[in-house]
Design a protein with these regions (language model features):
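Surface-exposed, charge/polar-rich loops and edge strands
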Residues: 1-225
Length: 225
C-alpha cells in the first residue's frame, strides 16, 4: 500500500490521527470509542508506533508501579511497535505456515546494564516484552558471530532461534562455544559503546512456539485469557 498527500507540512501520523480509527481487539465485540484513545493505553506508554496496546500492561496503574518501586524491584521499559499481525489469526494447520510480521524495537543501554546486574533474569509483562527480550539474546548471538555487524544485520528472523545449533541447555553454539545470555547482552552493550549509541534500534519476527528455550525471560505476567 502506497500513501501520498499534497501538504508537506502535515506528517503522516497526523493524517492517521485525523481520519484513522484506533484498532481494538475483536474480542471486545464493539466499535471503537473516542475514550479508547486514553483508556485503551498503558500508563507508561510514551512513543507512538504500535497498532495495539500491550494488554498485559493495562493492569498496571501508577499506584501499582509506585508500589513496585517502593519494594525495591528494578523495572525497565522496552519498546516494541506492535504490528498489524497481532490481529492476524493463525489459519494454517501447522505453525510453520504462520508468517510473523516484522516489528521494530528500541531498548536503552541502561536496560542492558540492569539485565547484567540481575544475571539476565527477567519477569516480562506481556508477550510483547517477551518477544523484545528474547530477541535481544539472538541479536547478541549475531554479534558473537560477527562483531562488526551493522544495525540492520541484527534483525531476528522468525525461525532463526530454532534453526541455530544449540547445546543441551538450549544455548546457541558459536564456533565451539555456547553463548550465555550474559555474554549476548554484553556483546550488545559493547556494540552500543563502540557505536556511541544509547539506544538499540532493530527489528524482529521472532515467534515463541512449542519447543522454544527461553534465554532471558523466566517469569511472565500475562493478560486474562
Amino acid at each position: 500500500v502506497d500513501f501520498s498527500w499534497d501538504d508537506d507540512s502535515v506528517a503522516f501520523a497526523e493524517i492517521l490521527d485525523a481520519i484513522g480509527e484506533l484498532p481494538i481487539p475483536p474480542y471486545l465485540n464493539r466499535e471503537t470509542e473516542e475514550t479508547d484513545k486514553t483508556t485503551y493505553q498503558t500508563v507508561y506508554s510514551k512513543i507512538k508506533g504500535s497498532v495495539a496496546a500491550p494488554t498485559a500492561g493495562l493492569h498496571f496503574t501508577q499506584k501499582v508501579l509506585a508500589d513496585i518501586d517502593a519494594h525495591g524491584i528494578d523495572r525497565e521499559e522496552v519498546t516494541l511497535h506492535v504490528g498489524a499481525g497481532t490481529f492476524k489469526p493463525v489459519k494454517s494447520e501447522e505453525i510453520e505456515g504462520h508468517a510473523m510480521h516484522t516489528e521494530y524495537i528500541a531498548v536503552r543501554r541502561q536496560t542492558f546494564e540492569k539485565l547484567l546486574a540481575h544475571e539476565c533474569h527477567a519477569t516480562a509483562v506481556g508477550t510483547t516484552s517477551v518477544r523484545t527480550l528474547e530477541s535481544l539474546y539472538y541479536m547478541g548471538v549475531k554479534l558473537a558471530m560477527n562483531p562488526d555487524a551493522q544495525e540492520e544485520d541484527l534483525h531476528v528472523n522468525q525461525w532463526e532461534p530454532y534453526d541455530l545449533p544449540h547445546n543441551e541447555e538450549g544455548l546457541v553454539i558459536v564456533g565451539d562455544k555456547a553463548v550465555t545470555a550474559a555474554e549476548a547482552i554484553g556483546h550488545l552493550r559493547h556494540w552500543l559503546d563502540a557505536a556511541k549509541l544509547d539506544v538499540l534500534h532493530s527489528s524482529t519476527q521472532i515467534i515463541i512456539a512449542p519447543g522454544y528455550t527461553y534465554q532471558i525471560v523466566d517469569k511472565l505476567i500475562t493478560n486474562f485469557h
